[in-house]
Curated annotation (Swiss-Prot):
3',5'-cyclic AMP binds at H406, Q615, F618. Mg(2+) binds at D447. The keyword Manganese applies. It holds the Pfam family PDEase_I. Hydrolyzes the second messenger cAMP, which is a key regulator of many important physiological processes. GO terms for cellular component: cell periphery; centrosome; cytosol; dendritic spine; excitatory synapse; gamma-tubulin complex; membrane; perinuclear region of cytoplasm. This is 3',5'-cyclic-AMP phosphodiesterase 4B. GO terms for biological process: cAMP catabolic process; cAMP-mediated signaling; cellular response to lipopolysaccharide; cellular response to xenobiotic stimulus; leukocyte migration; neutrophil chemotaxis; neutrophil homeostasis; positive regulation of interleukin-2 production. It comes from Rattus norvegicus (Rat). Keywords: cAMP, Cell membrane, Cytoplasm, Hydrolase, Magnesium, Manganese, Membrane, Metal-binding, Phosphoprotein, Zinc. Residues 51-77, 96-116, 685-736 are annotated as: Disordered. Its EC number is 3.1.4.53. One of its GO terms (molecular function) is metal ion binding.
Amino acid sequence: MKKSRSVMAVTADDNLKDYFECSLSKSYSSSSYTLGIDLWRGRRCCSGNLQLPPLSQRQSERARTPEGDGISRPTTLPLTTLPSIAITTVSQECFDVENGPSPGRSPLDPQASSSSGLVLHAAFPGHSQRRESFLYRSDSDYDLSPKAMSRNSSLPSEQHGDDLIVTPFAQVLASLRIVRNNFTLLTNLHGAPNKRSPAASQAPVTRVSLQEESYQKLAMETLEELDWCLDQLETIQTYRSVSEMASNKFKRMLNRELTHLSEMSRSGNQVSEYISNTFLDKQNDVEIPSPTQKDREKKKKQQLMTQISGVKKLMHSSSLNNTSISRFGVNTENEDHLAKELEDLNKWGLNIFNVAGYSHNRPLTCIMYAIFQERDLLKTFKISSDTFVTYMMTLEDHYHSDVAYHNSLHAADVAQSTHVLLSTPALDAVFTDLEILAAIFAAAIHDVDHPGVSNQFLINTNSELALMYNDESVLENHHLAVGFKLLQEEHCDIFQNLTKKQRQTLRKMVIDMVLATDMSKHMSLLADLKTMVETKKVTSSGVLLLDNYTDRIQVLRNMVHCADLSNPTKSLELYRQWTDRIMEEFFQQGDKERERGMEISPMCDKHTASVEKSQVGFIDYIVHPLWETWADLVQPDAQDILDTLEDNRNWYQSMIPQSPSPPLDERSRDCQGLMEKFQFELTLEEEDSEGPEKEGEGPNYFSSTKTLCVIDPENRDSLEETDIDIATEDKSLIDT
């Protein structure tokens, strides 16, 4: 399968200059500091190199301790509008999804036209301001180590104005760009224009144009910048990928956010534990089952695992023929109503619940048949309608109707969402038909035979599946095994007319995409995509080539992952129905854990779970950062999705019940526990030693007034500042 090669090019403004100053916006008070999160806001005076914070500021940030931390924690962060992608194709060059780009031109060939491919345009100034995710906050507010792995700020990209760069590897590249630019200024060297000198044709800056003081200052800053880069590179573990630097940074930042959330209230602690246990890939303690449970499991282990569990006999006729296939692939007495619903097949937010109601609860078969007809995939890959419907009905039968959320309704919703994301204008003509087939098929099978419990539950109970897959992505591996095994059933092989090479490639892609739906891999997926996009933003070549399997599957994996986490981006009516279903499934798992005498998983206890708060946390820490990154890739096509997401988040925030104040003694205990959880010590600086003493105080006492951030336990977004007078005994004549 061949298709025109697609590239993503970053185009620079014709008026970009080679060097520009940077300014830092930090929230300081004249007499007091505010405790919170800082956010670097560099503004370009003129473009040409990636703007970074001054080295002196970065070095002081790296070495600082939480004492006297003069930083502010904004409750809302202004949205930096993201670049768009315009798509064209390169007719003279072909991309083979199995083999990569056609020979004859290097992907990094500077003669390659930047106007042909995926072009990252500058941001549109008219876009409304929107909250940014926690990824754009400082990651070192309370970092005591002077060897922080990443910058303490977010950085604007070189050719995209205020697009902030947050991934460590892209920040190192940006810093090296500044070093190179400063070197040309200091040495007055001017070579022929090349991909690293986009502004080489500008008037040269001569050595004498810099005063001696400015020259020495620039030389010292350049040396310090280079030292910073070396310091970062020396700490990189050679067996780690550069995107793992971003993954570790994001995990560290999320852990800090969750720590804050857990300290606010009991319900916040439960939400924090749920997000941490579900979306962070870490080794959890395995709960040892009771002896009676061991006896039950022992009987299961005695069965030979020679077959894939979950595969059952057909519950429908396998003798379908083309003449018996209905218009929508399913029998229905409500064809007109179903046709009306399917008019939204290509729209974000199709009501899949109505489709299920009009299709005799066959939403997956109906949606998949409609998508394959819409995309002409049946004809392209020579799939007979009867074989396709037979397989889809067999697949749908292997979704459990008694599971509240992870059933065929969810699979149909993810498949339709993937179909819409593949059709986004920014990605038009980017993916081959085989890749499209693989993505939609992966979405359809990604939760087949889901038992309605989590991977950790299966591991803790020593289930047969956990033993078979060695506790690694247990359910995701099982979904793949069942999905592919069903192709071997009678009249079910929808890929029988693919070539051997196509089948192998499709299988590899589907496996990669379904394994990516393991929520514990979320941070790695997010970091991979963000690193890829930001790295190409800061490189002078400005070209993101989707000409190899790794880059292309990375986009597809994140696409299916986005579709899997798309409920909060749909209309509030649909979102609330999905929320009710997932909470019902969680509570059913909690009941099973209670019956077994196990510790109940976070958000699975129907007596204590805070549904509204869990959805706000889910959006803030998981869904928003993911869709924000996806919007970076397909700007401006995802703006409406982000708007809906923010509206839904605000609605759930408004629905959080206001808890009454606890008794005084209980509040005292909570405060004591909160203080014990703090991982840093707050030290306030001494007031001017010549200041007036308070009446009744001796010379060994001083008064210090500082501004602290007081956070509402039920609403972190509302902050108020309170002046606190603290009397402290001065035991030293030296300022602390």
